[in-house]
Amino acid sequence: MSHELKTGGDRGYKRIATEEAFATREQIDAYLRMVRDGTADKGMVSLWGFYATSPSERATQIIDRLLDLGEQRIRHMDETGIDVAVLALTAPGVQPLLDVAEAKGIAQRSNDHLAEHVARYPDRYVGMTAVAPQDPEWSAAEIRRCGRDLGFKGVQIASHTQGEYLDDPKFDPIFRALVDMGQPLYIHPSTPPDSMIAPMLEAGLDGAIFGFGGETGMHLLRLITKGIFDRYPDLTICVGHMGEALPFWLYRIDFMHQAGIRAQRHDFLKPLKKTIHDYLRENVMITTSGMAWEPAIKFTMEVLGDERVMYAMDYPYQYIPDEVRTHDNLSITDAAKRKLMQTNAERVFNL
């Protein structure tokens, strides 16, 4: 069913899109330099070697839209009925950069750049903080600065940082800052690290088609099984793309996790206070970015509850107006649809 897409809540809810990307020229130039000088990993060469250099319509259009935080983006939001966009620096952020000082500088300048545009469009944009996990203490300070001084409402990290994962205790300053500020962490996909990407590259499966979800789902699962929510019970973590497949594997994940604990298969695998299912229902938010598919959305709502799912478009990578209509036309209750499109995001991001 086709209908006109309008902002303003004419269907009983406003549309808050929760995984929307922007970039800075400085960031993309750094990627291009790394691709050309051989310091980029294989995933970055595959993904940004395409987007930063290809003359194809898709690549040039996405770069143009990533760099725009002005009239074009607002027009696209108006044309698709998006009332509010939650914006974050596009993946992989500054995490691939080998020079930590450069990474911190680009992250800080991108946060200030975003803040200027949030101030220009305060009713349309919400900011998320970019950090450089290469320096966890600096990242914690930047989370506090952006929350207190810039009014940002969350933090995005693009999965692994040069093959390192957030379950390493050295990243705890980031989690302490998140809990102190009462803000969610959004773990956005990145291309898999060199240690796992080879068989994906051989079949063209390294990006959004499969590699993103497989690697990011594993990251969240690592955090859960290593006890992140036992240590930080008030922490909220968001993941996109209908949970990076975890809701669909949840029965077997829970079963085999418990079996491994009972068998003491791994010395480092310790019992958790709750089941993995419980943590997903209580501490994790799922967004529909890139997954405008009714069976998947309804299944995830059934398994995790309608308070755990939020709408996202994944602009500019998947700017498809009919996918907004798909969400509007979901065969769920009006109350569940309002949670999906508006009030869950308002709760999680404290809007």
Mark where each language-model region is.
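Aromatic-lined substrate-binding rim segments of carbohydrate-active enzymes
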Residues: 74, 78, 99-108, 167-182
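Surface-exposed, active-site-proximal loop segments in enzymatic domains
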Residues: 90-106, 137, 202-205
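Mid-to-C-terminal alpha-helical segments outside catalytic/metal-binding sites
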Residues: 1-16, 23-84, 112-120, 141-145, ...
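Alpha-helical scaffold segments that form or flank carboxylate-/histidine-based iron centers
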Residues: 129-134, 138, 238
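Soluble or luminal CAZymes and related metallo-dependent hydrolases
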Residues: 65-69, 106-113, 138, 166, ...
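Short glycine-enriched loops at secondary-structure junctions
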Residues: 133, 189-195, 315-317
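Catalytic pocket-lining loop regions of alpha/beta-barrel enzymes
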Residues: 5, 118, 145-304, 308
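Short coil-to-beta-strand
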Residues: 79-89, 193-194
